Amino acid sequence: MPDFSRELALGGVVAGVDEVGRGPLAGPVVAAAAILPADLPPEIAALIDDSKRLSPAQREAALAALIESGAAISAAAASVAEIARLNILQASLLAMRRAVARLAVRPDHVLVDGQVAPDLPMPCTPVVGGDGLSLSIAAASIAAKLVRDRAMSRLDRRYPGYGWARNSGYGTKTHRDAILGLGITPHHRRGFGPLLPPA
């Protein structure tokens, strides 16, 4: 379970940052940033974990509790066009920078999930497996996952048949079969695999 030890060791205002959506065949990559109150109640901390370990209902409950606790949370995306122009890593880092810039509170330090840190105007520390280690990063992972899933559900209503409300744009059999049968939409990532040749 993630804890608050890294944040406490750094002192000051610490934001956790994570992204979701690097691997899908369609849709944006979304990042979120979270600054948790130092006195976060233990019953709320117990709700927070790596978003991949939580059900949709658990993620919704955790985010609602975090907002109620006074956590500062923001999210931002990089579009399919930006992914094509920059590459997925650089687009992910762009979304992270945008999420940090949107925070209502400027952090003194940022903890980011993964091996590569975005270029930010404050110190930034990458934490491999951070969404399972840091409460702030885990909170960001929950927010990013919810924001991206909601975006893909909206796109699913505009482009029915690809199953995006269920597969979030990942390359499931249903999604791959739909690409073969229905073709490619403007929200597919060209160059992501043999079904999506470069434009």
Curated annotation (Swiss-Prot):
It catalyses: Endonucleolytic cleavage to 5'-phosphomonoester. It comes from the Bacteria. The keyword Nuclease applies. It is found in: Cytoplasm. GO terms for biological process: DNA replication, removal of RNA primer; mismatch repair. NCBIfam families: PRK00015.1-3. This is Ribonuclease HII. It comes from Acidiphilium cryptum (strain JF-5). The lineage of its organism: Bacteria, Pseudomonadati, Pseudomonadota, Alphaproteobacteria, Acetobacterales.
